[in-house]
Design a protein with these regions (language model features):
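Substrate-binding cleft of secreted/luminal carbohydrate-active enzymes
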Residues: 232-261, 267-299, 303
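Alpha/beta enzyme core
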Residues: 1-243, 257, 261, 299-329
């Protein structure tokens, strides 16, 4: 579950793996003689935005985590203002905020880490104050207007969650981050507008982020027309970085489920051909290349490396005589 229940270095490790994949794709392209400026050249080194959660501890943890993210190749990193020890997905209950000042200090830690590394890196500040109704401490003047006077059995203070608390934190974070993001429970243009207007009034030109989350039931909240125009309306309000968390995994799981369900009904390979292979062939004209999966992962590239090492010819090249060479070209 999305509760920081994994090792501190898990995300930097994943960023490194993604960047290694980009490097391999670029190497394969280069080995084919395709260079920048050539027709068909693809810049594979897309910017990676990495999730630092709540920093996995205090300011020093955030500092070291940011350094590791940068070393792994992250172009942007986002930090949220929850208590790291009780961190939850933004669409779960039981979220506990840290004081505004503590969250700001983690953003300062991240910026300092980027300065120390000498690498320009985007910092995204996320607040969970729209839904979070608990906070660890009552000392911060920025948080006092939202305290209810109640405490929980764990000793946390209850706060009034919602738009005003979100604005208070978004405005506080804006000077210390390149982008500001407020996690919300529903796709609400009205909420997004008020948050954006308040942050931009305090910090003109600040870029905003928005999570178009699959945790929203989109059709329960908006009609088809509203869904179709939602992201353009967000952009007009200043939300220049919009993303769908977990889009890829939902696509993978759903389509794998559909195929497995069809396959299990009988005539197994018929469904693979109709649902996967033939659509893959048809998608080639749009630029799809994974039909030739051996070539995609670098087999041809390593054949070239083998040929060079062996003086210009080799009898052990992998693609030569393969089913991929014979049937997919």
């Amino acid at each position: 579950p999305d509760q920081s229940l994994y090792a501190y270095d898990s995300v930097p490790t994943m960023v490194r793996r993604i960047n290694n994949t980009f490097k391999r794709a670029d190497e394969i392209q280069w080995s084919r003689g395709i260079n920048p400026g050539d027709e068909g050249f693809i810049d594979y080194f897309l910017p990676i935005v990495a999730d630092a959660e709540a920093g996995f501890g205090g300011v020093l943890n955030a500092f070291e985590l940011m350094k590791n993210m940068i070393a792994a190749g992250a172009a942007g990193v986002h930090f949220e203002d929850q208590l790291a020890a009780a961190k939850k997905c933004g669409h779960m209950g039981g979220k506990v905020l840290v004081p505004t000042r503590e969250a700001v200090e983690k953003l300062i830690s991240a910026r300092f880490a980027a300065d120390v590394m000498g690498v320009p890196t985007l910092i995204l500040a996320r607040t969970d104050a729209e839904a979070a109704n608990l906070i660890t401490s009552d000392y911060d003047e920025n948080d006092k207007p939202f305290l209810t006077g109640e405490r929980t059995q764990e000793g946390f203070f209850r706060v009034k969650n919602g738009l005003e608390q979100s604005i208070s934190r978004g405005v506080a974070y804006a000077p210390y981050a390149d982008l500001v993001w407020c996690e919300t429970g529903v796709p609400d243009i009205g909420f997004a507008r008020e948050f954006a207007q308040a942050v931009l009034a305090a910090c003109p030109g600040k870029l905003l982020s928005y999570n178009c989350s699959p945790s929203f039931n989109w059709k329960k909240n908006l009609n088809d027309s509203q869904i179709a125009s939602f992201q353009e309306e967000l952009s007009a309000l200043g939300y220049k970085y919009q993303f769908i968390t977990l889009a890829g995994i939902h696509v993978n799981w759903f389509n794998t489920f559909k195929f497995a369900h069809a396959y299990a009904r009988g005539e197994g390979m018929k469904h693979y051909v109709e649902m996967v292979q033939e659509p893959e062939f048809a998608a080639r004209e749009m630029g799809y290349t994974f039909v030739s999966h051996q070539q995609e992962v670098g087999t041809g590239y390593f054949d070239d490396v083998t040929t060079v090492i062996q003086g210009g010819s080799s009898s052990v090249k992998a693609l030569t005589g393969s089913t991929e060479e014979e049937q997919f070209h």
